[in-house]
Amino acid sequence: MYFDKDNSMSPRPLLPSDEQKLNINLLTKKEKFSHLDPHYDAKATPQRSTSNRNVGDLLLEKRTAKPMIQKALTNTDNFIEMYHNQQRKNLDDDTIKEVMINDENGKTVASTNDGRYDNDYDNNDINDQKTLDNIAGSPHMEKNRNKVKIEHDSSSQKPIAKESSKAQKNIIKKGIKDFKFGSVIGDGAYSTVMLATSIDTKKRYAAKVLNKEYLIRQKKVKYVSIEKTALQKLNNSPSVVRLFSTFQDESSLYFLLEYAPNGDFLSLMKKYGSLDETCARYYAAQIIDAIDYLHSNGIIHRDIKPENILLDGEMKIKLTDFGTAKLLNPTNNSVSKPEYDLSTRSKSFVGTAEYVSPELLNDSFTDYRCDIWAFGCILFQMIAGKPPFKATNEYLTFQKVMKVQYAFTPGFPLIIRDLVKKILVKNLDRRLTISQIKEHHFFKDLNFKDGSVWSKTPPEIKPYKINAKSMQAMPSGSDRKLVKKSVNTLGKSHLVTQRSASSPSVEETTHSTLYNNNTHASTESEISIKKRPTDERTAQILENARKGINNRKNQPGKRTPSGAASAALAASAALTKKTMQSYPTSSSKSSRSSSPATTSRPGTYKRTSSTESKPFAKSPPLSASVLSSKVPMPPYTPPMSPPMTPYDTYQMTPPYTTKQQDYSDTAIAAPKPCISKQNVKNSTDSPLMNKQDIQWSFYLKNINEHVLRTEKLDFVTTNYDILEKKMLKLNGSLLDPQLFGKPRHTFLSQVARSGGEVTGFRNDPTMTAYSKTEDTYYSKNIIDLQLLEDDYRIEGGDLSELLTNRSGEGYKCNQNSSPMKDDDKSESNNKGSSVFSGKIKKLFHPTSAAETLSSSDEKTKYYKRTIVMTSFGRFLVFAKRRQPNPVTNLKYELEYDINLRQQGTKIKELIIPLEMGTNHIVVIQTPYKSFLLSTDKKTTSKLFTVLKKILNSNTNKIEKELLQRNQKVIERRTSSSGRAIPKDLPTSKSPSPKPRTHSQSPSISKHNSFSESINSAKSNRSSRIFETFINAKEQNSKKHAAPVPLTSKLVNGLPKRQVTVGLGLNTGTNFKNSSAKSKRS
């Protein structure tokens, strides 16, 4: 079919020649009108032929039997009024308001037939295209509900404005041709914001350009219609960006918005890093008041962030980007004062990761309180300069938001800190409402009802600096108004009334009009809430709590734990009682000592029963049942005890003791720090055997020994000298495992006792004074490698590869490449003029770790082995055979049996720099050999956990050995007459030292490190003196210095009598004289 010039349909079909003629005519008309005045109306120009339109659209329109009307390239329904100066003076504000864009036709764009917003609708492309047409405005002038009607004069072809009243107004409509588009000032998810300047008035606007094809393809038409509806609804507010006009062309849709020349709020914070308290108060008040205005008009923004807060020419905030807003339906039929239910939930996942609320992530819903959460995040960012929930990616950010995991920066103002802590709350019912935020002490000098937050001059922008005023705490009683008024009610408690808006011309009207006291209503009404009836379970818990309080009042002398802890302790006591009944063979004393609640490492001070007397007392470790139950832990959890070593296996008795105060039923407090005469039974020593115990029962000593863990890993045995050389070349070190907790000796004492090497055995007292044979530490069985499986028989490589975590191939390549480098070195050494020769070349061209280690002569191979750790402190190393052993009928052959509980055996973790490689190596050190275990990170952590259990379960056994050893050393010392007896070691046979001016701790007498380090040689004297000094500094309380004698009592500069001075020295002239004096005495 063919369309004539008068838009009448012709039955003749459309021919290709017709299309060519129409295109030629179109170009001719375009050239003809290109030189005309730009104010010439677009409707007066000849229209483009409708034969160039989509054929599918034509067929669809034919079915609907609608008259085919040509559509202009630029729609001019929504316009910017352009008055002459004389006409503007004669028009009042109401008349200007009448001809503005505020047409009611746009307000129902996103609504359905029943008038409800935000509902799903058909996403058909044709419906989307019609929706876009409606957003830009209908082409039918007579359908508009404006009071101004536009008609065309056939003679002049210029628009004439006719009003239903007698007054007439000359209005010039503007389209896309009337603006000059400049640079891009913003970019959104599906739009681009450009600077548009009016050609006539030179006034600048922000033109938001949206691609219609993209909107239809990505199903974003709904968001565009919501944004226009929200902007039209809030168009008269100073806190929201104004929408002046909407128009379109064939490819794009245009929103002509208010231009904010000072950019967004995020750029301001990035420029200054942070904002001081005055600026934060000024902008926070405007933001929270703008959010209140949105909620009072039934709009939830749902994407409030600094990027969506603009700054106008007066440095006041403007909210923008309402594409993801939630439009609430009014609950009443009142047009003047509609009410909205803010508790309406939405399940749409919208927002930005750093500002999204936790209820959306945890419970997949959100309501009006998501805007309050975002406000709290922005307030935090104003001071800290970064959002409270920030991570490297969105997933980690969401994890922090879900857990409400954030930390205040140092020097954060205490008043703002209090406000942020009450806003960023996971529980919605405990989160502050807008009315409570406005009543907070932070906004005490502001009045939100008279609009003064918008009329005040903005303060000077300055970054935040800590000062004495910011560190002032919240005044007492200032937050009484913030007592929660329970916002968890539904229905009327969330009904808000629409707040009145001011005139669109903010400059010509006062701010008090916007916030009229008669029409203003707070977002959350303060309504008293009826108490919910308590259920039976809650009533029973409350009754038990009352009974417990009454019992404690009746028994003032007996203190019992309260709250959830008492319930957990009662459960622990019941469990202990049940265990005692199931095993009647054990005595009551042993059962009490075996309880995890009563077992505590010696030296731990008792927790006082009164928290007021010692508020900083450390809490002792709780029982296993308490830890397993969901009970809040105490504010301080003591570190785990470190492994037992020859220097710290024996716990020092503190110089002061406190009287023990028992709790009821269970002993939470640690026992007195004295040596127990009862054998402490380990929790792992259970009489019941498990599956692993039965499998390895041939190698277990008795039924009480149990298998704690089995693992297959790389195993290597080496001497300490070899290991030390390889570690020195790798800059590695052996340290106490981090899982064992804080070591009880300082780094200085480690250096002193190891002769300058932290991990060595040089000058170790255990090796010089009281050495043991190799069999006491481990036993070794010879195995035939030919009988083993291939995995256990084939060597894995050298120890160097194990330390640097290098594969065999890579290591061989390094070995093959090393001769080439040696040749190069020899050639460079022959050149005498070469600058990089000898040591200088080694300095600038260091060799790799594998090359350095491969140059050593010692080769130590590692193999695959299976290790078994038992509750008796045994570390068994097995090799797997191809055929079962004919004697034992087992496929595993025992190679090493290491005693982990033997004094002198240490558990270490080998650490090397990252550039040398990565490994996870456990080292078991003995004075003779070192055993290295290599596995992955997860298994290494589990191994250290089991090793810690083993070491901590043998405290009393080591204490007994130390006492016996001390007694033997004392006997040996007293039998020799020519050997000096240190005064720090008390014994019944040794002469008592002369009285000192300060109290001496008895702890030194029980430590064997000094007694074992005694040597008759004079060369060892300095090491003994330094050892005594280290032990005294670590274990004893602070001693008072001895008084300096008077000069009259000095003989040749020395006192007449022996006076003990620092470092364990006395004033005797030499060691022999002191011993001689002791004989005479």
UniProtKB/Swiss-Prot annotation:
Catalytic activity: L-seryl-[protein] + ATP = O-phospho-L-seryl-[protein] + ADP + H(+); L-threonyl-[protein] + ATP = O-phospho-L-threonyl-[protein] + ADP + H(+)
Compositional bias per record (Basic and acidic residues), positions renumbered to this chain: 527-538
Pfam families: Pkinase
Domain Protein kinase: 179-443
Entry's localization field: Nucleus; Cytoplasm, Cell cortex
Compositional bias segments (type: Low complexity): 564-575, 582-602
Activity regulation comment: Sphingoid base activates kinase activity.
Single GO MF annotation: protein kinase activity
Keywords: ATP-binding, Cytoplasm, Endocytosis, Kinase, Nucleotide-binding, Nucleus, Phosphoprotein, Serine/threonine-protein kinase, Transferase
Active site per database record: D303 (proton acceptor)
Biased composition (Polar residues): 494-526, 805-819, 998-1017
Residues found modified as Phosphoserine: S138, S619, S1009
Ranges annotated as biased composition (Pro residues): 632-645
SUPFAM superfamilies: Protein kinase-like (PK-like)
PROSITE patterns the record matches: PROTEIN_KINASE_ATP (PS00107), PROTEIN_KINASE_DOM (PS50011), PROTEIN_KINASE_ST (PS00108)
Residue ranges of the region described as Disordered: 494-652, 805-833, 970-1017
Notes concerning its domains: The PIF-pocket is a small lobe in the catalytic domain required by the enzyme for the binding to the hydrophobic motif of its substrates. It is an allosteric regulatory site that can accommodate small compounds acting as allosteric inhibitors.
Annotated function: Serine/threonine-protein kinase which is part sphingolipid-mediated signaling pathway that is required for the internalization step of endocytosis by regulating eisosome assembly and organization, and modulating the organization of the plasma membrane. Phosphorylates and activates PKC1. Activates YPK1 and YPK2, 2 components of signaling cascade required for maintenance of cell wall integrity. Required for stress-induced P-body assembly and regulates global mRNA decay at the deadenylation step.
Protein name: Serine/threonine-protein kinase PKH2
Taxonomic source organism: Saccharomyces cerevisiae (strain ATCC 204508 / S288c) (Baker's yeast)
